[in-house]
Amino acid sequence: MIKAFRPLFFIFVILLFAACGTPKTILTRQSVAMPKREFRGAWIQTVGQSRYQHMNSAAMKHYFSEMVRKLDEAGINAVIFQVRPEADAFYKSELEPWSRFLTGVQGKAPDDPSFDPLAFMIEECHRRGMELHAWLNPYRVKTNISNRLAGGHIYERYPERFVQYGNQLFFDPGLPENRSFICEVVRDIVSRYEVDAIHMDDYFYPYPIAGTPFPDDKSFSMYAASQGFSPSQRGDWRRNNVNLLIRQIKYTIAGTRPSTRFGISPFGIYRNRRNDPEGSDTNGLQNYDDLYADIKLWVEKGWIDYNLPQLYWEIGHAAADYTTLLHWWNANNFQQHLYIGQDLKRSIDKNELQTKIRQSREMTFVHGNCYWYGYQILDDFEGVAGMLKTDIHPARALIPAYTHMHDGRPGAVKKLTEVFTEDMHFLTWEHNKRPLQPETAQKFVVYRFHHKEKIDLNRAENIIQVTPDNFFVLPYEGGDKRYIYVVTALDAFGNESKPSRIKLKL
């Protein structure tokens, strides 16, 4: 994320003039109710973390289980879990070594050979009806050049494919073989793990260090001319390198597991208006010019499935006003899936979190938020967990449907039945769930209505459970209260089936 290991250059972002004016197009919803469909994510960062390396596998399982439980209670429905912070792995991999942030030493496996953190997190999220997005950093290899790499690391085999910039080490983005290797890592994850998405954040070309050019002369001289770029077009060439990677990752995912999404969380400013008349009324570092990340192109071309810009600034910030940027992204995302990255600490310090969420919900094309950073929810920083649960997420929400990937509906559940046993009262149903067929039912939504209440499946407050199971345990309320329960199926793309209903007395 933009806070972790950022070079000191970042004073470059705190700039000249107060943002003023509004974008030409302001699109808002006519009314804002509690949304039934809303992305509610939390980033779980592993880079720079020391908490895991002091845990054995049993302790880590308990910690992960409690993490997912607490996030679920706060209304989070998608966990973005960092599994590749430094060309390493929080999962079993034959391509890259175990992460030092997991066990303290790169290449050292967990004490329990059967423990796979990514697989465990997927299971914990899915059993609660939540998504797991596997978060990868594409180019970074070392956050500090003095860090030791495990034997057999790809850098040890091909040091010529890497460059040092400042005090860090990176894959050279200009080399085709590096793009292929990164895609091989993606293919390995998607083929072996039921991740709901592959996620990358704002780290493409590294954040610039004042007075220090990025050392890619060698790859530029090797490839630029043959790719149609002149010596004066190095910026365009760098953008093309990242474009090629993003497109190749998308095709890799689509060819491996078509239901898996690809999401990007870019830095919050695409371009400033002073550099581009279509840019935002801001004065800060830019995706396009400084990180060589043309996020608008990726959205327009359909190379990514969701865009999650990090709008971490305060409302009224002099260089990058939150509200100005929110309106700009709302008007410049080609009506595709758009979520907003929120900084919990900065927002709470300014007493702005609820206002920011309300503003995001007023936007026509914004359909969710993601919180940086997730550990603050777990630690209940300034009471944020309770605020999310009670004030911001008082009702459950389903992930927005990715109809551009598949727009059919799964079959409705059948034989919705009330079952009594000696010690349990529950609903059960049949379905056409097939794990290898993502267009079939993958999880189920349970709604509850009072017996005289109108059945309206658009009311988020009537959702009482999202589950992968084909049963739901019913509460006991004295035996004289009448309800209507409704069950629907969701496919892997979030499309919802027709409802099945049953009348009950609890």
Where do the protein language model's features map onto the residues?
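Active-site-adjacent "subsite" loops/lids of carbohydrate-active enzymes
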Residues: 37, 45, 49-62, 134, ...
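Catalytic domains of carbohydrate-active enzymes, especially glycoside hydrolases
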Residues: 62-89, 192-195, 297
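Aromatic-lined carbohydrate-binding/catalytic grooves of carbohydrate-active enzymes
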Residues: 75-112
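Aromatic- and acidic-residue-enriched segments that line the glycan-binding/catalytic groove
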Residues: 89-104, 140-166, 202-227, 273-285
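Active-site neighborhood of glycoside hydrolase catalytic domains
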Residues: 177, 181-185, 191-200, 204-281, ...
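Substrate-binding cleft of secreted/luminal carbohydrate-active enzymes
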Residues: 292-318, 329, 334-405
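Pro/Thr/Ser/Gly-rich low-complexity, intrinsically disordered linker/stalk tracts
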Residues: 387-439, 494-506
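Beta-strand-rich modules
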Residues: 474-496
